[in-house]
Amino acid sequence: MKYAFDPDWTAKSHEIAKTLGYKWVMPDRLTVVRSWGSKTRRTIARIHCIGKVMMLGMGHKKSFYVIELITEKFDRQPQKEQLETIIHELMHIPRTFGGGFRHHDHVCSQNVKAELERYANMQVLVK
């Protein structure tokens, strides 16, 4: 597998989080990377965080999240679905921003689609 930092989607994810009012998402501790060569069949993107033990071992006190976009899958999505994917991954970040994840009982299709619609409506209001 190969990985590369994606500045465009990093900036877009920060903008989405800000627009949706996700004040707990700290832009300086969230990045987006692309990966190539994944063998996964269904995964389009995933979110990672350095575990507390690793953070402590590395001398870091603050959590850091990375959204990984599986390039072969993500790039085939229409723009609306790409936004939905990013929102889905952002919704996994808990309000504590402490290194954990919110589970799929919260990050379900219905909630993600509601957030996507809310984001789209906010974009219309801005224009």
Protein language model features and the residues they cover:
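Metalloprotease/metallohydrolase-associated module, dominated by Zn2+-dependent proteases
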Residues: 1-80, 96-127
